From Swiss-Prot:
Name by which UniProt lists this protein: Transmembrane protein 47
Domain of life: Eukaryota
Residue stretches spanning the membrane: 21-41, 83-103, 115-135, 152-172
Compartments, as annotated in UniProt: Membrane; Cell junction; Cell junction, Adherens junction
Self-association and partners: Interacts with CTNNB1, CTNNA1, PRKCI, PARD6B. Interacts with FYB1.
Alphabetical UniProt keywords: Acetylation, Cell junction, Membrane, Transmembrane, Transmembrane helix
Pfam (any one): PMP22_Claudin
């Protein structure tokens, strides 16, 4: 503390820790992976005869070269999966914007907890959608050929994992780690 007569002022500096920066990168990667998962045409594929995305289901009879596609938005479980996944992605987007704004504005520390809570909420929504999807798919769609959950489904899991990682990084208290920076 400086005396009033010396002309020195007390300046508070908020240091951006690498943990929070890596957390923000995790959130950004989660957003990119969510976008790829939602737009992916391949959540389930089966021997070049069937594919299922969040938006449409297509079949190709073995003896024809024409695909027959229909919207998946007529099925309650597929609408629920899409709503949960998009809800989680929206929360991740809000958390990313809050995290980005907190870096640009000097008061970062007060935004850490809300970002972490939003990310944990998004993880819960996305895990629910990713568990619901294969259970209801196997229950309702009877394929007599080999099928596999494809890269669109994997991207959604990747987004969920990166969101969880970002949430953990935003939970860490930088005061406990000042010696390392």
């Amino acid at each position: 503390m400086a005396s009033a007569g010396s002309g020195m002022e007390e300046v508070r500096v908020s240091v951006l820790t690498p943990l929070k920066l890596v957390g923000l990168v995790c959130i950004f990667l989660a957003l990119c992976l969510d976008l790829g998962a939602v737009l992916s045409p391949a959540w389930v594929t089966a021997d070049h005869q069937y594919y299922l995305s969040l938006w449409e289901s297509c079949r190709k009879p073995a003896n024809l070269d024409i695909w027959h596609c229909e919207s998946t938005l007529g099925s309650d479980w597929q609408i629920a999966t899409l709503a949960l996944l998009l809800g989680g992605a929206a929360i991740i987007l809000i958390a990313f914007l809050v995290g980005l704004i907190s870096i640009c504005v000097g008061s970062r520390r007060r935004f850490y907890r809300p970002v972490a809570v939003m990310l944990f909420a998004a993880v819960v929504l996305q895990v629910c959608s990713l568990v619901l999807y294969p259970i209801k798919f196997i229950e309702t769609v009877s394929l007599k050929i080999y099928h596999e959950f494809n890269w669109g489904y994997g991207l959604a899991w990747g987004a969920t994992i990166f969101s969880f990682g970002g949430a953990i990084l935003y939970c860490l208290n930088p005061k406990n780690y000042e010696d390392y920076y």
